Regions:
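Ser/Thr/Asn(+Pro)-rich, low-complexity disordered segments
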Residues: 1-93, 99-116, 255-583
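Extracellular polysaccharide-recognition and catalytic grooves
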Residues: 76, 80-90, 99-283
C-alpha cells in the first residue's frame, strides 16, 4: 500500500481511475484503515476529478481512464471503478471517514448515469457481467429496486443468450478472470437469493468450460482463445482463480498486491470439476462462441498435446489456432500460435496505443479465417484483407503483411528425413512442409497455399530469432512493405500424434508426406483438400463474402452446440440449475 500510495499521491499522466479506486478499496479493507484515512480522502479527491460531472456531456457520470485525459475515452472505466466502489460500500463503509464516505456516495450516485449511458451488448461478456453486478449492487446500496431489477433482467438475458450461443469471449485467459470476479461478487455480496443462485450456476458453467478445455501439462487452457494478450504462453488474470482453486501451484512468494479484492472475488469450484479436467483423456471439445455459424471453437486434448481451432477470427486479440505441447518449461512452454501480422511483431511483444484511451496492447490483424478439424488434424485458411476491409481508425496502419506460426524453441524441426540445423538465417521449407518433435509428440505442417499480395506463390520459411522469446516461427511473407490493395492468402494442414518412438516418428513423416493434397485459387474462391487419418478434409471458401461453399471431414457428430465434450452437451443443464457437475 505504501508503494501504491507513492504512485498515486501526485497522479502521473498514466495514473488510472481504476487504480485509484483499487487503492481506496485495499486501504479501507486493511487493518490500518484508520491510519490511512487521509490517504483514502486524497485518493477520493483525485478520483472525483476524473469523473465527468457535466450533465450536458455524453459521458456524464463516466470516468477518464487515465489522469491525462480531458474526457472519458474508454467508457468501460465506469464499470471497473464501480465494480470496486460498490464492493467498498457493501463491505467497508464503516472503515471510511465521513468525508471519504461522502465522496464515495457522490461517485456511486453519479456512476448510475454513466452506466446507463454506456451501451453494452450481451456478447461483450466481461463488461456485460460486470454491469450486471454493478446494477444489482447499486440497487441495494442506493435503495433503488429498479436498478436491481434491471441487473436481474440483464442476468437472465445473458443466461438465455449463452444457452443458445455459448460464451463469446471464449476461453480468454484474461477475461475469464474478470468474469469470475464479477460472478463471485454476485454470489457472495448481494442480498438477493434468486440472483445469487443464478450467479452460482454461471460460475459452475465457467468452471466446467475451463475443465473441458484444460491442458494439464501446461497448467492452462488449451485450444483457440478469444482475447488472449499472451501470444506465447496464454496466461493472465484467470491464473489467480486457478491458484485459489488449487489447479495450479504458484512458486511466487511475494505478498498479494490486492488481497482485499482477491478475497472478495474468490469462489472455489467443487473438486469433482477439477477431477473432470484431469480425466477423460483423450477428448474432443466443442463450443459455440457467438451467433453466426462460424462462431465456434473445437479442440482435441491428448496426454501430451492439445490442438484447437476456431471457425473465425473475431478480433485483434484472438488466438484462432493453438497447439499446446507438454514441454520442459511446463506452463511457460511456448504454444504453436497462428496469426497474421501487419507490424513486424511475430511474438506479440511490441505494444502500441490502441482504442479510445490508448491502452498499450499488441494487436494482430483480423483476417478472414475458416477451418475444419477432425480429431488431431486441422485444415485452416486465412486471407487478408477480410471480406469487409478495415479502416484502421484506431489501429496502426499496416507496414507489412506476414503470417506466423509461433513454435516452442525446444521443438526439434525436421525435413522428411533429417533434423534441420536451425540457424538465425530464414530457411525455406522443402515442398512447403516440415515436421516438429517434442518428447513422444510429432507434428506435421504442410502449407497448401502461400501467396503474396501479387498472387504469386512464396515459400514458408523457418525463422530462428534467437532465444529471447523461447520461440521460433514459420513465416509466410505476403508483403515486406505496406500491402496496399493486394490480398495475402495462406492455408495449411497440420497433423499431431503422440506415443511415438523413433520408428513411429519416421512412419508418421512418411504417412503425412504421402497424404494427397490439393489447393486451387480461382478468382475469389479457394478450394482446399487433404487426406486425413479418418478421411479427406475439404474446405472451399469464397474470399469475397466469407461464405463457406464446402466443408467436409470435420467431426460433426462431436460438434454439439452450445458446449459439448465427446458429443455430450453440458451447458444447458448447468444454466437451468441442475446439480450435475457438467460433462
Amino acid at each position: 500500500l505504501d508503494k501504491a500510495w507513492a504512485k498515486i499521491e501526485k497522479p502521473a499522466p498514466n495514473t488510472g481511475s481504476r487504480e485509484l479506486m483499487g487503492f481506496i478499496l485495499e486501504a479501507a479493507g486493511s487493518s490500518a484503515h484508520q491510519q490511512r484515512a487521509s490517504q483514502i480522502e486524497g485518493a477520493f479527491q483525485s478520483l472525483e476529478k476524473m469523473q465527468d460531472r457535466d450533465p450536458h456531456s455524453k459521458t456524464f457520470g463516466n470516468f477518464c481512464w487515465y489522469w491525462h485525459e480531458q474526457k472519458p475515452g474508454d467508457l468501460n472505466a465506469v464499470e471497473f471503478v464501480t465494480q470496486q466502489g460498490a464492493l467498498l460500500k457493501l463491505r467497508f463503509a464503516d472503515n471510511l471517514s465521513p468525508k471519504a464516505l461522502e465522496s464515495l456516495d457522490r461517485i456511486l450516485t453519479l456512476a448510475v448515469e454513466g452506466i446507463h449511458r454506456q451501451k453494452v451488448n450481451v456478447d461483450y461478456t466481461n463488461i456485460f457481467l460486470m454491469k450486471v453486478w454493478n446494477l444489482l449492487a447499486l440497487g441495494e446500496i442506493l435503495k433503488k429496486p429498479e436498478l436491481a431489477q434491471e441487473g436481474a433482467s440483464m442476468q437472465d438475458q445473458w443466461i438465455d443468450f449463452t444457452s443458445k450461443n455459448g460464451i463469446t469471449e471464449y476461453l480468454s485467459p484474461t477475461y475469464y478472470g474478470v468474469d469470475l470476479d464479477s460472478l463471485a461478487l454476485m454470489a457472495k455480496d448481494l442480498s438477493n437469493p434468486p440472483v445469487q443462485d443464478k450467479a452460482q450456476r454461471i460460475l459452475r458453467l465457467f468452471w466446467n468450460n475451463v475443465a473441458a478445455n484444460w491442458f494439464e501439462p501446461g497448467g492452462r487452457l488449451g485450444g483457440a482463445h478469444g482475447r488472449d494478450y499472451d501470444y506465447l504462453t496464454g496466461h493472465d488474470a484467470l491464473d489467480r482463480h486457478l491458484k485459489d482453486a488449487g489447479w495450479i501451484i504458484s512458486k511466487e512468494t511475494k505478498p498479494q498486491e490486492v488481497p482485499t479484492f482477491d478475497d472478495a472475488t474468490k469462489w472455489i469450484p467443487p473438486d469433482e470439476i477439477h477431477q473432470k479436467a484431469l480425466g477423460g483423456i483423450p477428448r474432443f471439445v466443442f463450443q459455440k462462441c457467438g451467433v453466426t455459424e462460424n462462431n465456434w471453437a473445437s479442440q482435441y486434448i491428448g496426454r501430451h498435446f492439445s490442438i484447437g481451432v476456431a471457425g473465425t477470427s473475431n478480433g485483434p486479440e484472438d488466438k484462432p489456432f493453438a497447439l499446446n505441447l507438454a514441454g520442459p518449461a511446463g506452463p511457460q512452454t511456448v504454444m504453436f500460435n497462428f496469426f497474421m501480422d501487419s507490424r513486424g511483431d511475430p511474438y506479440g511483444n511490441k505494444k502500441v496505443p490502441t482504442g479510445a484511451s490508448g491502452h498499450m496492447k499488441s494487436h494482430h490483424l483480423v483476417p478472414l479465417l475458416r477451418a475444419v478439424q477432425s480429431g488431431s488434424e486441422v485444415l485452416l485458411l486465412a486471407s487478408w484483407p477480410p471480406e469487409a476491409r478495415p479502416n484502421f481508425k484506431k489501429e496502426t496502419q499496416p507496414v507489412c503483411l506476414l503470417s506466423h506460426l509461433d513454435i516452442p524453441f525446444e521443438a526439434v524441426a525436421w525435413t522428411a528425413d533429417k533434423p534441420l540445423d536451425v540457424t538465425q538465417q530464414p530457411m525455406s521449407l522443402p515442398e512447403n512442409t516440415c515436421f516438429f518433435r517434442m518428447g513422444d509428440v510429432a507434428i506435421g505442417v504442410r502449407f497448401l497455399l502461400s501467396l503474396d499480395t501479387a498472387g504469386q506463390p512464396v515459400s514458408a520459411q523457418l525463422v530462428n530469432d534467437g532465444t529471447a522469446w523461447k520461440a521460433k516461427r514459420l513465416t509466410v511473407t505476403h508483403s515486406l512493405g505496406a500491402p496496399g490493395e493486394g490480398r495475402g492468402i495462406v492455408a495449411f494442414a497440420i497433423r499431431v500424434q503422440e506415443g511415438l518412438d523413433d520408428s513411429g516418428f519416421a512412419a508418421f513423416r512418411r504417412s503425412f508426406l504421402s497424404s494427397k493434397t490439393s489447393a486451387v485459387n480461382e478468382g475469389n474462391v479457394v478450394r482446399l483438400s487433404t487426406d486425413g487419418l479418418k478421411g479427406k478434409l475439404s474446405l472451399d471458401v469464397d474470399l469475397a463474402t466469407g461464405q463457406i461453399l464446402r466443408s467436409e471431414g470435420g467431426d460433426h457428430s462431436l460438434q454439439i452446440a452450445p458446449m459439448s465434450v465427446n458429443g455430450s452437451e453440458y451447458s444447458k443443464g448447468l444454466l437451468d440449475g441442475q446439480s450435475a457437475v457438467g460433462f
